[in-house]
A protein has these predicted regions:
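Glycine-rich phosphate-binding loop of ATP-dependent small-molecule kinases
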Residues: 1-151
């Protein structure tokens, strides 16, 4: 599956979290915002290449964070920079969904929502593992939280 290329997202829709000016968290956040707004197509293409994205048919903001190599490279970085990357990943995730529903082969979207730690990701991935039944043919799966967003 190829990403529909529509150009870059507007950096102004990626909210800043208000980190202390000059802090590493603020610098990482700005890097993520800038990269998302200048390389949207490339980041979304990278997302489709992640095995867990199921060729971009599974859309999830936590997984979207993995398109940033510095974040994906270690558990320590994922813990340390999670808040700095959250809003950029959320906007990229929304853009991935927006583009996915424009694909002519997508006929439905399965939404999986629940609170943090409820097992949404496990359930979502198990749907794909049982795909021999054809249950997800021509579908995308969008997983999200029903708790207040981080931004």
């Amino acid at each position: 599956m190829r990403v529909i290329k529509l150009g870059n997202i507007d950096i102004n829709i990626i909210r800043k979290k208000g980190f202390e000016e000059g802090s590493i968290e603020e610098r990482i956040e700005e890097y993520c915002r800038t990269t998302a707004s200048q390389h949207t197509d490339g980041l979304l293409e990278r997302y489709t290449q992640l095995d867990e994205s199921r060729n971009g048919n599974y859309i999830n903001s936590d997984l979207m964070k993995m398109v940033y190599p510095f974040y994906a490279e270690s558990f320590e970085n994922r813990t340390k920079y999670n808040l700095s990357i959250t809003n950029s990943a959320a906007v990229l995730t929304n853009e991935a969904f927006r583009r996915a529903i424009q694909r002519p082969d997508v006929q439905r979207c399965v939404f999986i929502v629940g609170p943090y730690g409820a097992g949404k990701s496990y359930f979502s991935q198990s749907l794909f593992e049982r795909e021999e039944h054809g249950m997800l043919a021509n579908s995308i799966v969008y997983e999200g939280s029903i708790t207040p967003p981080a931004f």
